[in-house]
């Protein structure tokens, strides 16, 4: 493969893969949240949707299977079929019923399984010199998929009903399957040619600075995750329709997220991972205060739109830096297991923040809750100096691979 072709083909494939990854995650964390809010389900129950995120934490227990059985491509295809069936089921059963929760959990399991295979494949095919470009494409595509899930599905629902919207959404994984059938590389996981992935992970954990790295993974995006959980319920509480919320997220949100992801990826390339984590993390934290101001002053539509622009752009910045960091510290030979464990730890913080969000926002009110989300970002930022040496050591150890 020529260098020019490699520089556009690998990021393009990453964009397709991570759109497929982001869409079901957006359904679980954005669409269902909005759907139940529109259906007047209690705010605390809406927040509990976040507890389904425990599935992404538990995926570490089946990630070795994906590293050792079959190909990443096969796992991705199987997960896409399961995602389609689960999405259709969400449209058929009543909201917040037992069957609805079962379908939601099935969707999460299929999505988490797909995540493992996609992350491993992306790490395997991405050289260090393309980390910035791939993660720009990844964040932009992933967030765009979440916006389509949270906004596009809502717009469709206002026109044909939520049942029709979920069934229409079920077609998207099948479209992606058809694209990836021709585009995804046909390479095996090659598990028989390397050491036990769990043993390799234990070696990684025992390296100097590993505990600090894990703490940063757990805490770095805690504030942003807590904020996102209560954005759509707040918009609905202010009298916006599902279509209005969808228009904001699909139009303004998509443009700003993609711009933020591209800018974040360029920032990583120019300034390195450590400085990107620190500076873009601060920007991401401060963006939470836009919603705090709007809720505190009960500001009108222009301010609401402005808060959405600031949050989505800055979210793209911070996420690009964070995902580059996760990929950088993984061993490519055990990509599925290592990345699954690290992302599972990240999911612990996300699940905790989101599951409690409805209760905290219900008791404090939206304004105080948004101030709290900004404060939740501080511990992760404060820990960054403790991992600076570890990142430098990782860069040195990976140098021969360039």
Segments and roles (model prediction):
Residues 77, 81-95, 282-299:
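C-terminal ends and interior cores of transmembrane alpha-helices
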Residues 171-189, 383-388:
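C-terminal membrane-cytosol helix-exit motif in multi-pass small-molecule transporters
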Residues 113-126, 317-331:
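Intracellular juxtamembrane helix-capping segments at the cytosolic ends
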Residues 1-8, 185-215:
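Juxtamembrane intracellular "pre-TM" segments in multi-pass secondary transporters
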Residues 333-362:
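A late C-terminal transmembrane helix in Major Facilitator Superfamily
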Residues 275-325:
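C-terminal transmembrane helical hairpin of 12-TM major facilitator-type secondary transporters
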């Amino acid at each position: 493969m020529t260098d020019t072709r490699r520089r556009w083909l690998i990021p393009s494939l990453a964009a397709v893969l991570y759109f497929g990854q982001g869409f079901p995650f957006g359904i679980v964390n954005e669409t269902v949240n909005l759907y139940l809010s529109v259906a007047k389900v209690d705010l605390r129950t809406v927040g509990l949707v976040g507890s389904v995120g425990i599935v992404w934490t538990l995926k570490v227990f089946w990630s070795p299977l994906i590293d050792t059985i079959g190909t990443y491509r096969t796992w991705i295809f199987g997960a896409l079929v399961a995602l389609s069936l689960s999405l259709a089921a969400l449209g058929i059963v009543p909201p917040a019923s037992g069957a609805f929760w079962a379908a939601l959990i099935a969707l999460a399991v299929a999505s988490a399984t797909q995540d493992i295979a996609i992350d491993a494949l992306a790490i395997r095919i991405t050289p260090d010199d393309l980390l910035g470009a791939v993660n720009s494409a990844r964040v932009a595509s992933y967030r765009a998929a979440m916006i389509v899930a949270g906004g596009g599905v809502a717009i469709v629902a206002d026109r044909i009903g939520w049942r029709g919207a979920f069934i229409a959404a079920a077609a998207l994984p099948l479209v992606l399957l058809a694209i990836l059938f021709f585009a995804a590389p046909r390479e095996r996981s090659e598990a028989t040619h390397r050491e036990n992935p769990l043993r390799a992970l234990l070696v990684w954990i025992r390296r100097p600075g590993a505990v600090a790295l894990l703490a940063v993974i757990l805490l770095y995006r805690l504030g942003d995750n807590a904020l996102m959980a209560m954005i759509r319920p707040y918009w609905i509480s202010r009298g916006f329709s599902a279509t209005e919320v969808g228009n904001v997220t699909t139009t303004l949100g998509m443009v700003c997220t993609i711009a933020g992801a591209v800018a974040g990826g360029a920032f990583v390339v120019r300034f390195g991972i450590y400085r990107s984590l620190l500076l873009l993390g601060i920007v991401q934290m401060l963006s939470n205060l836009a919603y705090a101001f709007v809720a505190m002053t009960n500001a009108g539509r222009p301010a609401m739109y402005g808060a959405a622009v600031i949050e989505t752009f800055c979210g793209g910045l911070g996420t690009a830096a964070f995902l580059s960091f996760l990929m950088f510290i993984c061993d490519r030979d055990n990509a599925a297991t290592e990345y699954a464990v690290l992302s599972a730890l990240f999911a612990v913080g996300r699940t905790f923040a989101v599951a409690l969000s409805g209760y905290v926002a219900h008791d404090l009110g939206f304004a105080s809750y948004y101030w709290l989300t900004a404060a939740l970002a501080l511990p992760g930022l404060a820990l960054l100096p403790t991992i600076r040496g570890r990142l430098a050591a990782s860069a040195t150890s990976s140098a021969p691979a360039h």
